[in-house]
Amino acid sequence: MTNIRKSHPLIKIVNESFIDLPAPSNISAWWNFGSLLGVCLILQILTGLFLAMHYTSDTLTAFSSVTHICRDVNYGWVIRYMHANGASMFFICLFMHVGRGMYYGSYTFMETWNIGILLLFTVMATAFMGYVLPWGQMSFWGATVITNLLSAIPYIGTNLVEWIWGGFSVDKATLTRFFAFHFILPFIISALAAVHLLFLHETGSNNPSGILSDSDKIPFHPYYTIKDILGLLIMLMVLMILVLFSPDLLGDPDNYTPANPLNTPPHIKPEWYFLFAYAILRSIPNKLGGVLALVLSIMILAIVPLLHTSNQRGMMFRPLSQCLFWLLVADLLTLTWIGGQPVEHPFITIGQLASILYFSIILILMPIFGTIENQLLKW
């Protein structure tokens, strides 16, 4: 009799995706982040579900309901802080995952890469709407400022913003619809993640050398299941240290003040994982130009495969491109720091220079360095 694992229509799919999947024998810990993102997503859906049982999406009671969760619900504070810091872990894993794709040339799997970009946008939208729900000062003003950016779109901008708000300002209608979208989007993300995996399994995984590994494959289980569990334990340890020792480390103190439309906080800023894009937005004096730069800072990932000039796939054997890649990482960290600073003299200039460098590295320097390395190898 055939093993049920290989014959049952449903279990067979799981088997081919997670058990008998042929995987390259040399993939490093950088390939852990896909499974970690899956765990993050499940964790966020579960904690979010329990939070939604106690949350009320009304401007008068939203802030109080979050306080009620933290004070009165059994272990509500753990659930709330796991959800808030879980989002941070989600984005850390996302950035590492995308960085891995950039470094090792995984973007040559075009369908997988493009679904990944779509996933990144969807996760960012979900996180933004989730930040609005506690209805603190930063929630309200963050929602006002970021949604207001759409008014820069010519002709339809103002109508579009009022349509999203459901009125003439961010109010009850906005909060209710944001809660509805925040609840449904993670399930859409789950579906997209399944498609992402489907496309990946059409081609098989890339590996650090960038060389085709069809001749040297090993089963995913037990080798990579054990390896992924190590990464999972490290991530859960970091998450729980954050949750149990300094749950507000990555949050904004202003969000412990209930939303007040009559009082603007001195410095409006989003969560840390959006700061790099926020810095790029602020470094352009023109509103429409800033919005375009903001969108392009992520959309630029879609043209990375078209700008690949090197004869080699990954950067493992390309020291010049490696230097450029780590310069890009340093630049993104600089942008993240600048996004959290007030808009005044040294920070404005640093932000503008870092923004120019960001686009220059991806659009100009990386293709040039790829060509130079091709020439060097000919000698």
From Swiss-Prot:
Q: Which PROSITE patterns match?
A: CYTB_CTER, CYTB_NTER
GO biological process: any one? mitochondrial electron transport, ubiquinol to cytochrome c
Annotated heme b b566 binding lies at H97, H196
Q: Main subcellular localization, coarse class?
A: mitochondrion
TM ranges are 33-53, 77-98, 113-133, 178-198, 226-246, 288-308, 320-340, 347-367
The family this protein is said to belong to? Belongs to the cytochrome b family.
The record's GO molecular-function terms, alphabetically, read: metal ion binding; ubiquinol-cytochrome-c reductase activity
- Task of the protein: Component of the ubiquinol-cytochrome c reductase complex (complex III or cytochrome b-c1 complex) that is part of the mitochondrial respiratory chain. The b-c1 complex mediates electron transfer from ubiquinol to cytochrome c. Contributes to the generation of a proton gradient across the mitochondrial membrane that is then used for ATP synthesis.
Under Pfam families, the record lists: Cytochrom_B_C (PF00032), Cytochrome_B (PF00033)
Binding, heme b b562 = H83, H182
Instruction: Report which superkingdom the organism of origin falls in.
Output: Eukaryota
- Entry protein name: Cytochrome b
Q: Does the keyword Nucleotide-binding apply?
A: no
Keyword Transcription regulation tagged: no
What are the required cofactors?
heme b
Alphabetic keyword roster: Electron transport, Heme, Iron, Membrane, Metal-binding, Mitochondrion, Mitochondrion inner membrane, Respiratory chain, Transmembrane, Transmembrane helix, Transport, Ubiquinone
Q: Where is the protein found, in the record's own terms?
A: Mitochondrion inner membrane
Provide the cofactor note recorded for this chain's UniProt entry. Answer: Binds 2 heme b groups non-covalently.
Recorded hits in PANTHER family, A to Z, give: CYTOCHROME B
Species, as recorded: Herpestes edwardsi (Indian gray mongoose)
